[in-house]
Amino acid sequence: MSTRSVRKIRETKETKIELYLDIDKKGEVKVSTPVNFLNHMLSTLFYYMNSTATLIAEDKQNFDDHHVVEDTAIVIGEAFKEALGDKKGIRRFSHQIIPMDDALVLVAVDISGRGVSNIELNLERDEIGGLATENIIHFFQTFSYNSGVNMHIIQLRGWNTHHVIEASFKGLGFSLYEASRIVYEETYSLKGSL
């Protein structure tokens, strides 16, 4: 295991989430959740993070998609934060503007330790591939809070819900990759810590 890799298990009465994440090694990505579209988006996220990841999520109660989406976001957020360690030398900031056919999405991140998010997506459909689109926004907010990453995801154009969501995950993945690269000798903050 590299020094910037993490294994996490979170188990509640509602879900069980297992994750291995290596943010420094581009390798195999395996994702298994009970929600097919979530599998697609998480695979996209990890791929564009240039990471190695294995995520298995079990929904014990099968009420709807909310619990598995939320708990998965918690685990990924906590794992990313843990993998970063003391954050010494990381680039810290990144932004992307991602086109996908009709869609154009801006993603900006600051690995500041302050998990505040602003998500502005106009998702026309209520559901896609077994996933309530309101839970896409909830995923991003929950990841931001638990990772300590300040995030803005803003839809600039687009009408196809799938394209808007996928562009958002691509942009987030690549922004997290760039912002987490070690490029400085010291912590990139006037305060001296993040």
UniProtKB/Swiss-Prot annotation:
The keyword Ribonucleoprotein does not apply. The keyword Isomerase does not apply. Keywords: Amino-acid biosynthesis, Cytoplasm, Histidine biosynthesis, Lyase. Transmembrane segments: none annotated. Pathway: Amino-acid biosynthesis; L-histidine biosynthesis; L-histidine from 5-phospho-alpha-D-ribose 1-diphosphate: step 6/9. GO terms for biological process: L-histidine biosynthetic process. Its main location: cytoplasm. It comes from the Archaea. It is an enzyme of class 4 (lyase). InterPro entries: IGPD_sf, ImidazoleglycerolP_deHydtase, ImidazoleglycerP_deHydtase_CS, Ribosomal_Su5_D2-typ_SF. Its EC number is 4.2.1.19. It is found in: Cytoplasm. GO terms for cellular component: cytoplasm. It catalyses: D-erythro-1-(imidazol-4-yl)glycerol 3-phosphate = 3-(imidazol-4-yl)-2-oxopropyl phosphate + H2O. PROSITE patterns: IGP_DEHYDRATASE_2. It holds the Pfam family IGPD. GO terms for molecular function: imidazoleglycerol-phosphate dehydratase activity. Coiled coil: none annotated. NCBIfam families: PRK00951.2-4 (NF002114), PRK13598.1 (NF010121). Belongs to the imidazoleglycerol-phosphate dehydratase family. This is Imidazoleglycerol-phosphate dehydratase. It comes from Sulfurisphaera tokodaii (strain DSM 16993 / JCM 10545 / NBRC 100140 / 7) (Sulfolobus tokodaii). The gene is hisB.
